[in-house]
Amino acid sequence: MKEPLKIGLMDSGMGGLSVLKELLKYDSELEIVYYGDLKNSPYGEKDASEVLELVRSVCNFLQKENVSAILLACNTATSAAAQTLRKEFSIPIFGMEPAIKPAILQNPGKKVALLATPVTQREEKLQRLKSELKAEELVLSISCPGLAGLVDQGDFDKAEKYLRPILANLQEQDVENLVLGCTHYVFLKQIILKNFPNVKIYDGNSGTIKHLLNSLQVPRVILNGSQNNRSIYKLILNSEKEFHFRLASKLLSLKE
């Protein structure tokens, strides 16, 4: 019997669980190891060099778990580490891409707001993407220090208070398209829609998972409601707080 393909996913904390949920929508017989580096979260306000070291350490751990590929299910980790680690590891390293391209192409000439961590906003990867799309004038970059940390704490009331003035300001500027440039923020979609009902939200999870499965030559068949998922996953959270394990379970079971 053929062994299932083993894939490693990593994030600074809970955000990558939104990517894991996307992966579990497919009828793909996978063995998934998820590592949440909560001990060192959040990544988004650290220096890029420190993030690189943290991500390298997690990837070394995942390689010892005998994974065949690693997905950095974290925009900050991707921005700071993906390019370097692809040269260091013999297995494929995949990363996240903010969904700026579909947002720009589907709304020609219209402004697009990008919510992301300070590291993601600063790094060359994002500047290069905006330049390739000739979208420097159209992308309104909004740095959100501390917001991912509120998701890791499960403090969605504080997250809503944090987002309200940002969303109100976007409505005043007639910005109708919002890109979530951090996998943590995907868990805030309902809060965003509650405060900004007409906004069109884009995130990179679906495109990333399609690219991952295509690259690994895994069939992309969406599960229907009655099918059982044949993939199995293991959650590793380097946290001593039982709360984090309960929160992870809650986030994985959230309806979209």
Swiss-Prot record:
InterPro entries found in the cross-reference section: Asp/Glu/hydantoin_racemase (IPR015942), Asp/Glu_race (IPR001920), Glu_race (IPR004391)
Source superkingdom: Bacteria
**Which GO terms fall under biological process for this protein?**
cell wall organization; peptidoglycan biosynthetic process; regulation of cell shape
Q: What is its EC number?
A: 5.1.1.3
Which molecular-function annotation in GO is an example for this chain?
A: glutamate racemase activity
Disulfide cross-links: none
Swiss-Prot/TrEMBL catalytic activity: L-glutamate = D-glutamate
Q: Name one Pfam family in it.
A: Asp_Glu_race
Tell me yes or no: is Isomerase among this UniProt entry's keywords. Answer: yes
Q: What does this protein do?
A: Provides the (R)-glutamate required for cell wall biosynthesis.
| Family to which this protein belongs | Belongs to the aspartate/glutamate racemases family.
Know the name of this protein?
Glutamate racemase
